[in-house]
Amino acid sequence: MINDRVIVPLDVPTLEEAIALLDLLPRVSFWKVGLELFVSAGPSILEILKEREKRIFLDLKFHDIPNTVAGACRSATKYGVDLLTLHATAGRKALSQAVEAISTGDKPPKLLAISLLTSINSRELAFDLKIPLELPEYALQMALLAQETGIDGAVCSPQEVSQLRQVCGSDFLLVCPGVRPTWAEAGDQRRVMTPVSAIKAGADYLVIGRPITTASNPVEAWEKVCQELAEV
């Protein structure tokens, strides 16, 4: 089902609030656990999601020396998560060691490289980070680096997904945050696109958070997203 390609973030500070969201949105099959909740609740939230037979996107964005990144990825496989993130800028060696580290697991997660945070715009890339590339070119270079090392896919802005799909091929997973329905505000995401447009551009999964979870009626918001995607 197309709805199974929507990942909803549990971007709340406590385990109790996370459970409340799970209870409120039982039809959501794929949930993202990020830094805030994981630091607060620890592996307990992953165990709860597994008990409820939900798919898990563990979005901790590992970025450290190669040995540490590899060890963190190896530890994460023990929780049975489906998707796991690390920064492409950790470098070729860290990416390669991460791939090797999870290869011995019974059901290893798909590794996703963060190409560039969707909150970063072209001015920040050039003037703050001193990277002399346009956003699409930089995102492509990071995705290609990840693909060369055996990483399964990338997290990227929907603005870059069409180019990445064309260059990286159909087997490279593309997960897009920065997806906003036509009726939702962009918030702090700079490079956004509607769910239908992102899927048509080549995204495998969409991360849609605040338009659903902070809506006055989250259940209604979820249904509206599903209705939009029914067009695809």
Curated annotation (Swiss-Prot):
Active-site positions on this chain: 61
Gene source species: Gloeothece citriformis (strain PCC 7424)
Lineage, top-rank taxon, reads Bacteria
Which family does the similarity line name?
Answer: Belongs to the OMP decarboxylase family. Type 1 subfamily.
Q: What is its EC number?
A: 4.1.1.23
* Protein residues bound to substrate: 11, 32, 59-68, 118, 180, 189, 209-210
Protein name, entry field? Orotidine 5'-phosphate decarboxylase
Naming one, the record's GO cellular component terms include: cytosol
The pathway is: Pyrimidine metabolism; UMP biosynthesis via de novo pathway; UMP from orotate: step 2/2
Quaternary structure (record): Homodimer.
GO terms under biological process: 'de novo' pyrimidine nucleobase biosynthetic process; 'de novo' UMP biosynthetic process
The record's section on InterPro entries has: Aldolase_TIM (IPR013785), OMPdecase (IPR014732), OMPdecase_AS (IPR018089), OMPdecase_bac (IPR047596), OMPdeCOase_dom (IPR001754), RibuloseP-bd_barrel (IPR011060)
**Which keywords does this chain's UniProt record carry?**
Decarboxylase, Lyase, Pyrimidine biosynthesis
CDD domains assigned: OMP_decarboxylase_like
The top EC class is lyase
Named from the GO MF annotations, one term is: orotidine-5'-phosphate decarboxylase activity
NCBIfam families the record matches: PRK00230.1, pyrF
Catalytic function, reaction form? orotidine 5'-phosphate + H(+) = UMP + CO2
SUPFAM superfamilies in the record, alphabetically? Ribulose-phoshate binding barrel (SSF51366)
State its role.
Catalyzes the decarboxylation of orotidine 5'-monophosphate (OMP) to uridine 5'-monophosphate (UMP).
Query: Gene3D superfamilies in the record, alphabetically?
Result: Aldolase class I
UniProt cross-references to Pfam families, sorted A to Z: OMPdecase
